[in-house]
C-alpha cells in the first residue's frame, strides 16, 4: 500500500478523525474569527492531543475542500490510504476465519458510498472492495459523508471485480449477492465465517459477471409497498444481519 496525504472537511468528519485516529491527523484548519462553539471544541481537542491548529481564511478552506461544504474546518490526514489489490489476500488471511467483506459493484453517488463506508466501519468489516471503473472513488464528499470512515477502512479499488471475487473464493470466502428478485431471503443465509456481501449500484444493480460469480443470491424481504431500498440502507441492513449472527451466544 502507498501513503498519501488527504484533506478531510466538515465538522463530523474532523471530529471523528481526531477522536478515533488522532495519530494520523497532521494539522487542523479552523476558520479565522469563527465563534462557533463546535469549532472551538474541535480546536481545543486537537491541541490537547498535540495536533497543530491553524486559523485560516474561508478562501483557504474552500481551496482544500474541493468544493465540498467544509463548515469552517478541515484536517490534513496523513495515513496509509491507498490499498492495492494484492493487499486483499493478506487482509483476509489476517482476519482468520471471520473475514467480512463489503463489495460495492458500481455505486456512483458519493453520498451513498460514504454512507456505505460509515456502516461498514461500524460493522467492523475487513475491507471494502469497489471497481475502478463505473464507480465513484474516494473523494472529499465521500470522506465527509462517511464521517472519516473512508480514511480508516481498507478500501480497495480493483480493475476486474469478477476476477477479485474468484480470488476470494480460492480463499474459501463465500460470496453472497443481494438482488431484489432472488428467491432466497437474506435471513436464511449463514453469514458467519469468511463472507463477502455484494451489492449493486443505484441504477442497474449487480452487473451480469458479478452476479454470475456469486455463490448465492438473496433478497431483503420487504412486506411494504416499496420495491427497493437505497444501496446504503441495504448495505446497513445486510451488514448488521451478519453482525447479529456473529455475535449470537
From Swiss-Prot:
It catalyses: guanosine(2251) in 23S rRNA + S-adenosyl-L-methionine = 2'-O-methylguanosine(2251) in 23S rRNA + S-adenosyl-L-homocysteine + H(+). SMART domains: SpoU_sub_bind (SM00967). It is found in: Cytoplasm. The gene is rlmB. It comes from Xylella fastidiosa (strain 9a5c). Keywords: Cytoplasm, Methyltransferase, rRNA processing, S-adenosyl-L-methionine, Transferase. The keyword Repressor does not apply. Its main location: cytoplasm. Belongs to the class IV-like SAM-binding methyltransferase superfamily. RNA methyltransferase TrmH family. RlmB subfamily. The keyword RNA-binding does not apply. Specifically methylates the ribose of guanosine 2251 in 23S rRNA. One of its GO terms (molecular function) is RNA binding. Gene3D superfamilies: 3.30.1330.30, 3.40.1280.10. GO terms for cellular component: cytosol. This is 23S rRNA (guanosine-2'-O-)-methyltransferase RlmB. InterPro entries: 23S_rRNA_MeTrfase_RlmB, Alpha/beta_knot_MTases, Ribosomal_eL30-like_sf, rRNA_MeTrfase_TrmH, SpoU_MeTrfase, SpoU_subst-bd, tRNA_m1G_MTases_N. Its EC number is 2.1.1.185. S-adenosyl-L-methionine binds at residues 200, 220, 229.
